[in-house]
């Protein structure tokens, strides 16, 4: 199977006018081998008020999901505060610093990328993407949101299809979550 590095994915979040859609593909790759086609990389949390998605190591991502969920409970669903506090923990905790995952978290007000270095990045335009197909999905979503009248769900679908047509680590077994 070659190397055992778990590769790529594509997760895309679009937040506009109080609505949010998050999409993720289903492919899991180890080295040069596809080992799963229908993984669910996006989900709802905190009473179905927050959307989250991940790229990178699945086990590491679930560790971060659990930590984020705990912070959301601690801060009563305040995504911005929970994300910042998780990032602080991520930077200070030796075990967390070794985690190899990126998270996207969004609600109707905020959208963040939480990086492996403990950064919290808030995109200027409400669009966020992580994973190997992220540049393609993000570029497509930006173009479509600026130059069409499509809904954000339609934009997410088309952007993910474009990413899947370019990125070999992204398939068309998409999962969508919406708020």
Curated annotation (Swiss-Prot):
Free-text activity regulation comment from the record: Allosterically activated by HslU binding.
Reactions the enzyme catalyzes: ATP-dependent cleavage of peptide bonds with broad specificity
Q: Which residues are noted in the entry as Na(+)-binding?
A: 164, 167, 170
Q: Which GO terms describe its cellular component?
A: HslUV protease complex; proteasome core complex
Per the UniProt entry, the Enzyme Commission number(s) are: 3.4.25.2
Query: What terms describe the molecular function in GO for this protein?
Result: metal ion binding; threonine-type endopeptidase activity
Q: Does the keyword Metal-binding apply?
A: yes
Residue stretches spanning the membrane: none
The record's active-site residues are: 9
Subcellular localization is given as: Cytoplasm
Predominant cellular place of this UniProt entry's protein: cytoplasm
Keywords on record: Allosteric enzyme, Cytoplasm, Hydrolase, Metal-binding, Protease, Sodium, Threonine protease
Q: Which family does it belong to?
A: Belongs to the peptidase T1B family. HslV subfamily.
Question: What is the name listed in the Swiss-Prot or TrEMBL entry for this protein?
Answer: ATP-dependent protease subunit HslV
Q: Tell me what organism the protein belongs to.
A: Syntrophobacter fumaroxidans (strain DSM 10017 / MPOB)
């Amino acid at each position: 199977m070659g190397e055992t590095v778990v590769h790529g994915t594509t997760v895309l979040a679009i937040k506009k006018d109080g609505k949010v859609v998050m999409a993720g593909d289903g492919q899991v790759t180890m080295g040069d081998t596809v080992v799963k086609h229908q993984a669910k990389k996006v989900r709802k949390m905190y009473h179905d008020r927050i959307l989250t998605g991940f790229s990178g190591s699945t086990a590491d991502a679930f560790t971060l999901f659990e930590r984020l969920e705990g912070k959301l409970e601690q801060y009563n669903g305040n995504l911005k505060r929970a994300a910042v506090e998780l990032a602080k923990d991520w930077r200070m905790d030796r075990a967390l610093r070794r985690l190899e995952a990126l998270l996207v978290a969004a609600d109707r007000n905020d959208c963040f990328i939480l990086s492996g270095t403990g950064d919290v990045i808030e995109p200027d335009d409400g669009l966020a993407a992580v994973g190997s197909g992220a540049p393609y999905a993000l570029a497509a979503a930006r173009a479509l949101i600026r130059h069409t009248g499509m809904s954000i769900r339609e934009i997410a679908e088309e952007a993910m299809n474009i990413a899947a047509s370019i990125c070999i680590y992204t398939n068309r077994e998409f999962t969508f979550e919406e708020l």
